[in-house]
Amino acid sequence: MQFFSTRDQNRKVTSSQAIAQGLSDEGGLFVPESFPQVDVKALCGLDYPALADAVVREYLTDYDPAFLTEATRSTYGAAFGGKAGYLAPVEGDTYALELWHGPTCAFKDYALQLMPKLLVEAKKNLGRTEKTLILVATSGDTGKAALDGYHDIPGVEIAVFYPTGGTSEIQRLQMATQEGANVAVYAVRGNFDDAQTGVKKVFGDKAIAAELEKRNIRLSSANSINWGRLVPQIVYYFAAYAQLLKAGKITFGDEVDFCVPTGNFGDILAGYYAKQMGLPVGKLVCASNENNVLTDFLTTGTYTAKREFFKTTSPSMDILVSSNLERLLYHVTGSDAEVAGFMQQLAATGSYTVRPETLAAIQETFSCGWSSEDEVAEEIRSRYEKDGYLCDTHTAVAFHVAAQKKRQGVPMVVLSTASPFKFPRSVLSALGKAAPENDFEAMQQLEAATGHAAPASLAALRSKPERFDTVIAPAQIAEVAMGYQA
């Protein structure tokens, strides 16, 4: 299996190269040359580690199969508490795919617990001995998940950049207290898009790359722009379908719809990849918060990033430039030149418009909707009062949209992407309680009000010392990168 850039089909690489490099030299994203067709029924009989092994090996064809078997088995065992890809019944034929039972309590763990192993093996496959410098822009969950996955990995340094004031306090503390000799965390003035643009500029700066190469350092990414982030996320769509099949809720071949709280478009794109591999996915419902740039695009075909930015209670979705949409545009248009043109227009004017036939092709699989802040709070409250199901703010966005888009007789799986205890003040307020200013007091009150226990890793943050408190401008991200030595 080869991979090539969304902006230049002539730039072909192996999966090891795609994972080690992260981003193509000209700024494009790596995509697979084809979608492998799998025996879905056979996969549905596997446990989660074996399922992950079977899916990722279809794409990572230059990796040793024995390595992939061991890597997936060791990743998706104890760290997920026996709940990897756990599907919870909620109401009727609506379900929650709980993706927050990993070490950092967010869905990013599924990729970022495996990806460090894939990177180390990729370097071995390529005969590379240089230091890898990973730069990560985060709207909250990716940062901690990447730090947890990569801390103290030999031959790797990682620097994480998050928007100051743009995460929950729990998310900030998860990053600021991270242990490890090879980790660094910076708050960036501005929003997530400012941080992400700053990181992308570093990746696109040939002078920086050349200087770092002299020091025997190569840049890489742990964001969902890296193919190594996407491939593990395909797996849990198969896992959800398998559980519905095993429970007798569907017959093999029946369609299942998925509603995904969406920011950078990586999680929902993994569902598209699962569908292309043969999984009977019906509709992929893209759920946005008040930063509803994707809702507008999927409705009109015009992407407009120059718009008012809202800080919401679902900060991981507070994004106006959704990077992985570029991959979908490539798959639908089949044209690297067209995609490159869209990205040039976006950089120059903040907007682009796809052809009507392109939009129609996208709408065959994708539908969309968005939730206001009031609707998110109401969804958390009503969902808990009606079904006893406690969800976080991002999941509430998806539940609200899923109710609007539910098709009669077709199961709807809502991707639950984070523990409600990562956002205790927002969830407590939504339940009609007066939320204290302190997140840990809010966490305790949320436990008392609901009878749910906070994950131990989150409760333990209260006693951990903060290691990182530096605030920088977006332009200083390049200075941070240039400060590293081999």
Where are these regions (language model features)?
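PLP-dependent amino-acid enzyme catalytic core
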Residues: M1-A486
